[in-house]
Structures are given as structure tokens and as C-alpha cells.
Amino acid sequence: SPENAILYLKTLLAKHPYIKFINFRDAIFNMFPDWFDKFIDMYKKEIGLPCTGNIRFDILTEETVKKMKDAGFYTIDMGLESGDQEMRFKYLRRYQTDEMIINCSKWFNKYGIAQLTYNIIGLPYEDIHRALKTIKLNARIKSDRTIPNIFYPYEGTPLYEISKEAGFIPEGDFTQRRVPLVQPQFPEEQVLFIEAYFMHFVKRYKWAYAMPPKLGKIYEKWLDHRVTGKQVPYKFLVWWHDRYSDARNHLKDFLVNRMPKLYVKLRMIKHHKRAQKTD
């Protein structure tokens, strides 16, 4: 019940008074709207710490989003998965239209709640043009952070069977492959390219959509060519990004192991900036 959840949080905070924000990792925090609305009201009155949580688009209302902001939500996580409506309906069984997603995102932008989206790249029958729709939808809803994940066909799931019947699952052990599916219309280097440069292009399409219409259309077409053009050096760009990621990870490991206090301080500054950004 909401009462028990609040009691648990109070007990936790009494034992750990240094906690400055809370990240609710419930898979779908607003699955039961009545429960969620009551919890938010109690959380605002009795806890009031900045917080984040996982949210579904199709069971939200503007009033709930406003309550979330008032209660201390500064970021929400949501599964966008694919920007191609047909892919969402046919393969993911997520019956959320583009219009529904865009309208909900307007509420988060209106009340100053940052958006983090989870996205899937390399779904069966996807190609780079459909993947680009995912980038563009993130730009249209003004996602603040994005997490692109490469699709993995878990045995026993409908998408595994679809992939197997289509011949996209290679023979032998595919678990160590960076891109598990082998699809002629969406080769490995293109999947890795989209994953690596996902947020880079989301930011640039945001610029395009913020420009005057005519100029924005020209810039958008230029960006389209940079993503899907026949002369894009996908393999080289993936190799370059891999080197950059390796260097960044080495620096992170160094800070964690040699300068842990500095690392924790930097993490806290990062979270506080995100919270302040949405105030």
C-alpha cells in the first residue's frame, strides 16, 4: 500500500540520513494510477526528496505529471523502444502512437521534468531508416538523456521466434556477438553506428526542429544524409567511437580505484545539476 511504502522510506531515511535523492527502480512505477496518485500525495507531504522513476506513457495524465513535479520528481525514465510506430505495434506490442508519446512529453517539458528514454536498436526487420525514426522521435520529445540498447533475442520470447523464422539468428553461439541478429537490410556496422552516435544525432535533430521551418528542413535533410548516406564510413566511425569509449572507461576506472572520493563527489555534482536544471 502507499502507506507501507512511505513507512519503509521513513525507516530507510532514519537509518541513512545522508540520502539526498531517491531512485525508484520499479519496472513501471505508475502501473496502478490510483495507487500512484495517492503515493505521490503522501510522498510530497512526508518525504519530499528529489526522485526519479520508470513511467509508462499510455496511463499518464497531465494532472499526474504536475503532481510528480510538486512531489520532487526531477527525471523520469521511460521505454520508448522504437520511433517507428509499425515496429512498436507489430513486434513490440506497445500500442502507443507517436502523437500519444509526443503529447505526454509536452507535459514533462511544461513542468520541467527531464526525460530519459530506453531505446532498442537492431530489432527484427528494422533497417537504418527505421532506426533513424527512433532518433528523430527522441529529438521531437526533447529527450534529455537516451540509452540505446542493441536487441538480443531471448529464447522463448515471441521476438526470438520471429527472428528465428526469418533466418536472422546465425548458426552456433551468437551470445558473444555485439549484434546478435544477422540482417541483410541492417548490417552490423550500421547497428553499431546508430548505437554509438545515438545521442549525438538526437541533439542535432533537436537543433533542426528548433530552427525556423525552412532552415530546419534543410538541416534535417543534411543530417539524414549523414546517417543514411551511401558514403557514410560506418566501420571507421564505429572503430573511432570504440577507441574513445575505451579511453573514457580507463579514466573512470582510475578515478574509482585511485580517487574514489573525487569520483563520488563528481557523481553527486552531476545529479545535483540535473535536479537543479528542472527546477
Predicted regions mapped to residue ranges:
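Aromatic- and acidic-residue-enriched segments that line the glycan-binding/catalytic groove
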Residues: 158-172
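Histidine/acidic-residue-rich catalytic or RNA/ligand-binding cores of hydrolases
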Residues: 36, 131, 160-161
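Radical SAM [4Fe-4S] cluster-binding motif and immediate context
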Residues: 1-118, 136
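Catalytic cores of alpha/beta
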Residues: 64-66, 124-140
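Conserved strand-turn element in the central/C-terminal portion of the radical SAM core barrel
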Residues: 56, 83-92, 105-130, 149-155, ...
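Radical SAM enzyme core and accessory elements
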Residues: 158, 175-279
